[in-house]
């Protein structure tokens, strides 16, 4: 048999026959190599034109279509049944379907979208440029990637007419519909997209930018893919691009694992638990499936099954045990064929592209990755050009399936088998909103933003846990910056100065409580009635604060609560926003002349009256004006119970400001290490009321603790956790993870538990976080540029170095830049 690829080359040189081709010494091969020195690889591609009305590609011997589909994260029976339906029922006999998963550094569009925010803030723009520059370098070094899944179908045709195109168009709708039913994003390729995608592969030059195709409908499609000045050199086992600036190698499977599943395909894009088995280069995984013509092949298989079964049951079977096993296998095949399973031919391939000096190491890494999962793959020799062409979309409909069969690279199986090795597993791609910029463990660059509606959560609240020194504060600071980048507002109530440098760097408002500060946070001053003129909901939270002032440990009784509520309403009716804590105390003492319980309440609040220790904070008109988009209140200098009360009143004032603000503006309210400030029987009521109110105006409570158990240390903290649709876990102790597994709110599987146990932080490189919400769990690595590392650092020497420079007259940005250059050589 003269294979089609050899035939195609032969036609260029007038060679009509070369039966029994010796691929090592073939004159055709020699001339093919010579041909590629002077002609274009595009001359070997089958693409002819594109029908813009139907979205179909008219190829040399087939008609086909291609589309990009969202990649899967794990699997379930429904998914596998949908894929199985493609091979078993939907695709016509003689057609081919190809799956091509690519992992490349073409991430500039992701970085650029993140970099080019519309906020207009110059300081944020400076941070974005520094981070974008850093991530572009990471991508060039193979540490940031994008995984894409391209599916193509091609049907050989003897004629191209409206009837044929109509049938294939209907097939296209059904196939794309199969992938769309799972809620994924499937997008049909047009001519521009096919040209751009194939150009990125065949003109590979290490760029992190995607090429944009520009289709000229008056020229053959295949002529528009390969650059006219691109040169290739074909060796026996690799293809060099432009004098071996980059090298392509293809690898085929020599042994499949005995047990495998569709979900396990995620292990073959890089090991999620071992950085040493992470693929640094561009790579492509291809599965081609050809649907055999049924009746003749099926009859032959049934006959062979009967023959083997007969031999196994003969006296010969007693002496040859392998016959029994073979008979059992063929018996199973016959049963499946009787159930209308189809016969297919398939091929699984891998291609890597890298610099010549790195390609051997990359190849060995790929082989090791597959071997660690029970596969054996090896480099193709003498057919590397055919292998390359056979991986490209729709080429199987133009004879490449026959060529691969001729080279003994395909295997025949039942139609359900390819499901398990379909390369459509990727890494999480997060949200569409350019919030936090993270990478997956295999390098997928993605955004995460808790306010993104497309993620399907019912609220925006976030619970964050991370041991000391594992990056929790940095993660929260970066989340704050992300909210500002989306034109949102951020309120931080802090104890420990974690946010001081950041808020000053961004020109925000820094409010510090200390012995010298003349701050008044009277909760009455900013109360504004709702649309109906009612203030009951506002006063309900003030009531909880006063109750905690009166009885911070034991809590107030129901009777005492009713007294406080009555006093609030009467004082409000008399004085409105001019009321203060002394007015409440006066009312209680006056009413207490008739009731001892009321009198006791008044006395319990003495510390917060005019003559009390803390009276200055709560009497008179509140003088805090929130006049920035980033506001940090530092309570670290306050000690004892006043810190807890100030915390609650600041929460109340933030809520008031959010409710008075623009309902379209997203607001993050960040509190760190504050679980113990929400204790007492009213803690849960306060938090639930707070969350319910701010949610109406796109507000999110973002609460951080060191351990998951901290969320169960007080009723208020537990309420915060139970009302959070997002849980972000940085490095945790095993006992905390065990607690999470028992949680009613966030349930994790055994596999997710194993992932969470592996979450770690490498100082100066990245902090890992497992983000749970919207029905999924994803690992993200927060990687910071040198400037941000210093900006967010709480390491004493770095923190103090910045502080000293600021005290000498430098701006925060200048000080951070100087220290970053000293520590890391750049900023």
Residue ranges with predicted function:
Residues 77-82, 86-92, 275-277, 292, ...:
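P-loop NTPase motor domains
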Residues 464:
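Hydrophobic anchor at the beta1->P-loop junction of P-loop NTPases
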Residues 1-423:
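Extended, folded cores of ATP/NTP-driven motor/assembly subunits in large transport
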Residues 472:
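Conserved lysine of the Walker
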Residues 508-511, 716-730:
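A short helix-turn-beta junction within AAA+ P-loop NTPase domains corresponding to the substrate/partner-engaging
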Residues 469:
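Walker A (P-loop) phosphate-binding loop of P-loop NTPases
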Residues 481-491, 506:
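Post-Walker A helix-loop "phosphate-sensing" segment adjacent to the P-loop in P-loop NTPases
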Residues 475:
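Hydrophobic positions on the alpha1 helix immediately C-terminal to the Walker A/P-loop
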């Amino acid at each position: 048999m003269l294979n089609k690829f050899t035939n195609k080359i032969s036609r260029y040189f007038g060679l009509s026959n070369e039966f029994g081709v010796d691929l090592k010494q073939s004159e055709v091969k020699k001339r093919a190599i010579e041909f590629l020195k002077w002609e274009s690889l595009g001359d070997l591609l089958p693409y002819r034109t594109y029908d813009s009305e139907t979205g179909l590609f008219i190829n040399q011997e087939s008609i086909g279509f291609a589309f990009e589909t969202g990649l899967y994260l794990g699997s379930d029976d429904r998914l596998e049944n949908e894929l199985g339906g493609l091979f078993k029922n939907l695709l016509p006999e003689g057609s081919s379907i190809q799956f091509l998963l690519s992992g490349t550094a073409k991430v500039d569009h992701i970085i650029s979208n993140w970099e080019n925010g519309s906020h207009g803030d110059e300081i944020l723009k400076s941070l974005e440029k520094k981070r974008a520059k850093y991530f572009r370098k990471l991508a060039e070094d193979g540490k940031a990637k994008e995984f894409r899944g391209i599916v193509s179908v091609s049907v050989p045709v003897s004629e191209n007419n409206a009837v044929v195109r109509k049938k294939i168009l209907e097939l296209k709708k059904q196939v794309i519909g199969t992938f769309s039913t799972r809620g994924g994003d499937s997008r049909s390729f047009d001519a521009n997209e096919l040209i751009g995608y194939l150009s990125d592969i065949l003109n590979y030059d290490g760029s992190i930018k995607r090429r944009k195709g520009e289709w000229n409908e008056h020229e053959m499609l295949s002529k528009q893919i390969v650059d006219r000045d691109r040169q290739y050199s074909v060796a026996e086992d690799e293809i060099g691009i432009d004098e071996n600036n980059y090298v392509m190698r293809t690898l085929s499977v020599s042994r499949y694992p005995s047990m495998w599943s569709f979900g396990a395909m995620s292990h073959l894009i890089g090991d999620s638990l071992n950085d040493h088995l992470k693929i640094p280069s561009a790579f492509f995984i291809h599965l081609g499936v050809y649907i055999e013509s049924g009746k003749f092949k099926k009859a032959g298989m049934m006959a062979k099954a009967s023959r083997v079964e007969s031999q196994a049951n003969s006296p010969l079977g007693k002496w040859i045990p392998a016959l029994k096993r073979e008979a059992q296998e063929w018996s199973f095949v016959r049963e499946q064929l009787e159930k209308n399973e189809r016969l297919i031919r398939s091929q699984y391939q891998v291609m890597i592209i890298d610099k010549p000096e790195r390609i051997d190491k990359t190849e060995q890494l790929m082989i090791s990755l597959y071997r660690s999962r029970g596969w054996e793959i090896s480099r193709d020799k003498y057919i590397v050009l055919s292998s390359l062409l056979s991986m490209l979309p729709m080429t199987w409909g133009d004879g490449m399936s026959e060529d691969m069969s001729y080279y003994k690279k395909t295997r025949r199986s039942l139609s359900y088998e390819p499901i398990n090795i379909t390369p459509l597993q990727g890494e999480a791609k997060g949200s569409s909103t350019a919030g936090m910029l993270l990478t997956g463990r295999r390098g997928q660059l993605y955004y995460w933003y808790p306010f993104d509606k497309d993620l399907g959560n019912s609220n925006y609240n976030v619970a964050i846990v991370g041991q000391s020194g594992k990056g929790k504060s940095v993660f929260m600071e970066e989340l704050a910056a992300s909210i500002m980048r989306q034109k949102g507002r951020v309120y931080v109530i802090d104890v420990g100065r974690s946010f001081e440098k950041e808020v000053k760097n961004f020109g925000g408002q820094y409010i510090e409580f200390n012995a010298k500060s003349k701050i008044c946070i009277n909760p009455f001053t900013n109360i504004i009635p709702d649309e109906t003129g009612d203030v009951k909901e506002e006063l309900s939270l003030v009531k909880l604060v006063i109750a905690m002032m009166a009885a911070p440990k034991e809590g107030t009784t129901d009777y005492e609560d009713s007294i406080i509520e009555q006093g609030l309403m009467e004082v409000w009716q008399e004085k409105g926003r001019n009321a203060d804590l002394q007015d409440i105390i006066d009312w209680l003492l006056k009413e207490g002349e008739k009731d001892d319980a009321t009198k006791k309440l008044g006395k319990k609040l003495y510390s917060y009256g005019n003559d009390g220790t803390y009276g200055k904070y709560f009497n008179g008109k509140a003088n805090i004006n929130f006049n920035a988009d980033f506001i940090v209140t530092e309570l670290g200098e306050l000690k004892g119970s006043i810190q807890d009360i100030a915390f609650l009143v600041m929460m109340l004032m933030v809520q008031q400001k959010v409710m008075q603000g623009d309902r379209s503006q997203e607001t993050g309210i960040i509190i760190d290490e504050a679980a113990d400030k929400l204790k007492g029987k009213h803690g849960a009521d306060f938090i639930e009321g707070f969350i319910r109110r701010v949610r109406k105006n796109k507000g999110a409570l973002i609460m951080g603790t060191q351990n998951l158990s901290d969320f169960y240390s007080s009723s208020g903290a537990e309420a915060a956790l139970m009302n959070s649709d997002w849980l972000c876990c940085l490095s945790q102790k095993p006992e905390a993870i065990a607690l999470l597994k028992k949680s009613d709110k966030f349930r994790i599987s055994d596999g997710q538990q194993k992932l969470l146990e592996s979450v770690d932080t490498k100082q100066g490189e990245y902090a890992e976080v497992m983000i749970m919400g919207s029905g999924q769990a994803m690992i993200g690595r927060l990687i910071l540029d040198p400037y941000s590392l210093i900006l967010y650092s709480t390491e004493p020497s770095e923190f103090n170095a910045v502080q000293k420079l600021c005290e000498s007259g430098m701006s925060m940005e200048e000080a951070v830049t100087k220290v970053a250059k000293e520590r890391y050589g750049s900023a």
